[in-house]
Every structure is written in C-alpha cells, then in structure tokens.
C-alpha cells in the first residue's frame, strides 16, 4: 500500500497544477486552496463508480490531511481508476472462458466413456455367440439397407427382396422401413431359415460396433462391423 501511494504521488506531481499547489503550501498562501475543484466531490464519484469506499479514505489521507494545500485535479488519478476497473473485468472474463472450455472437455469425455462402456457390455454379454468376425468397412451413410448390404457383402436387390418378404430385423424386431438410421450397438438381421419344431430361426447378423471420427478420402464413414454368417436364435412372435 505504501509503495502504491508513493507511485501515485510521483505520478500526479508531474502535473503543473500539482507544483503550483505545493508552492502555495510552502509559502502558506491561502489563495492556493482555490486552484482546483473540490476533492470530496470527485472522490465520492470515484468511490461510487468503483464500489470501493476505501479509495476515498486513501486519497483523502494522502492529499487532504497530510498536504492540505495540494489540491490536485481529479483527472490526475482518474486514468488509474479506469485501468484498475478494466483489469478486474478482464480477469473475470478470462475465468469464465476457462470454465466454459473445461465444461466442453468434460462433456466430450463423458460421451467417450459412455461409448466405451457400451462396447464392453457387448463384449461381456454371455448370450452373444463368439462365432463372429470383425470387419473394418466404409459406408456412405448409416441407413439400415446400406449398412446391412456392406456388412454381408450382398447386393441391393437381395436386401430389397428380403425387406418385402418381412425377413429383415432391427434389434430383433421386424423392420418396417429399410431407410431407418442405425447407431452403434444396433443389430441388423437377415432371416435365412427357421425350425418350427424347435422354435428357432437362423439369421445372418451385423452389429455396428464402432464408428471412427476420421472419414475416408471419398468422405465415407469408417466403421467396424461384427458379422455372424449363421446365428441361431429363439423365434420371436412378430407383430403384423
């Protein structure tokens, strides 16, 4: 506080009015008191704007009590007050920006953790038969028919025929729209046989296991598809 007072005093003494006021104090000239505007009015304005009443006490002690004849112009310290207020606002703005970045990073990490947990659950599921193969493919979109065709390496016509025959399943439910969008964790089945006596059906299954962030040079999505060429499942009664 003492160092700040000295620096402030040194700065204001560079003004001509300050030296005139000081000369009046040394000579004891009463008229020197009328050289400048009243400090009380300015200090009230300054403390109100900055919301810091202690500034009024500080400047009053320095100039009014110790040097009563040194009546300086309020403009001598006004820039100091403005810079102080600006620095406070800048610090608050920086803190808010850092907080926003931290929140965005936290949301991305949470999303990544959810995806990892979902993949681990699929790996540990005891009901999933392990006679599968993981394939890295590239798809133009995440439409059901596009993903199934790519994963099973079959033609588009075969997918359409199976759809109209009611042989396509999405998450073990009958597919009603072949343009449905699929996501990570969805299973796509093509019915290839059934055993009415045993109450089972055989399907070719595709599981959308993973989607990479980077696309191919032709702007296709890079994915990992898990394929079962023959998977026997309990037959479910499908709604018409």
Curated annotation (Swiss-Prot):
Alphabetized GO MF terms: ribosomal large subunit binding; RNA binding; tRNA binding
Keywords on record: Mitochondrion, Phosphoprotein, RNA-binding, Transcription, Transcription regulation, Transit peptide
Cellular component, GO, one term: mitochondrion
Bias (Acidic residues) ranges: 116-126
Localization, UniProt: Mitochondrion matrix
Domain S4 RNA-binding intervals: 142-217
Induction cue: Up-regulated upon depletion of mitochondrial nucleic acids.
Result after altering residue 156 to A: Decreased RNA-binding. Does not rescue diminished mitochondrial transcription induced by EtBr
Transmembrane segments: none
GO BP annotation list: regulation of mitochondrial transcription; rescue of stalled ribosome
Transit peptide stretch: 1-84
Phosphoserine carried by residues: 106, 116
Main location: mitochondrion
Region (Disordered): 95-127
Function: Mitochondrial RNA-binding protein involved in mitochondrial transcription regulation. Functions as a protective factor to maintain proper mitochondrial RNA level during stress. Acts at the transcription level and its protective function depends on its RNA binding ability. Part of a mitoribosome-associated quality control pathway that prevents aberrant translation by responding to interruptions during elongation. As heterodimer with MTRF, ejects the unfinished nascent chain and peptidyl transfer RNA (tRNA), respectively, from stalled ribosomes.
Assembly: Monomer. Interacts with POLRMT. Interacts (via S4 domain) with MTRFR (via C-terminus). Associates with mitoribosomal S39 large subunit, peptidyl tRNA and nascent chain.
Annotated protein name in UniProt: Mitochondrial transcription rescue factor 1
Gene: MTRES1
């Amino acid at each position: 506080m003492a160092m700040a007072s000295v620096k402030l005093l040194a700065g204001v003494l560079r003004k001509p009015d300050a030296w005139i006021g000081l000369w009046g104090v040394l000579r004891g000239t009463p008229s020197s008191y009328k050289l400048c505007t009243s400090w009380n009015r300015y200090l009230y304005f300054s403390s109100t704007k900055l919301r810091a009443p202690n500034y009024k006490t500080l400047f009053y002690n320095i100039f009014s009590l110790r040097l009563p004849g040194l009546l300086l112009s309020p403009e001598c310290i006004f820039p100091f007050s403005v810079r102080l207020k600006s620095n406070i606002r800048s610090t608050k703005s920086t803190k808010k920006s850092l907080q926003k970045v931290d929140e965005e990073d936290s949301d991305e990490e949470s999303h990544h953790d959810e995806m990892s947990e979902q993949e681990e659950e699929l790996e540990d599921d005891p009901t999933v038969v392990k006679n599968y193969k993981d394939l890295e493919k590239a798809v133009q979109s995440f439409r059901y028919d596009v993903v199934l065709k790519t994963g099973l390496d079959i033609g588009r016509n075969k997918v359409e025929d199976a759809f109209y025959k009611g042989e396509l399943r999405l998450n073990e439910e009958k597919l009603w729209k072949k343009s449905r969008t699929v996501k990570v964790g969805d299973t796509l089945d093509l019915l290839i046989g059934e055993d009415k006596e045993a109450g089972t059906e055989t399907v070719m299954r595709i599981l959308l296991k993973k989607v990479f962030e980077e696309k191919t040079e032709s702007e296709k999505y890079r994915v990992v598809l898990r394929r079962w060429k023959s998977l026997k499942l309990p037959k479910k009664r499908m709604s018409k």
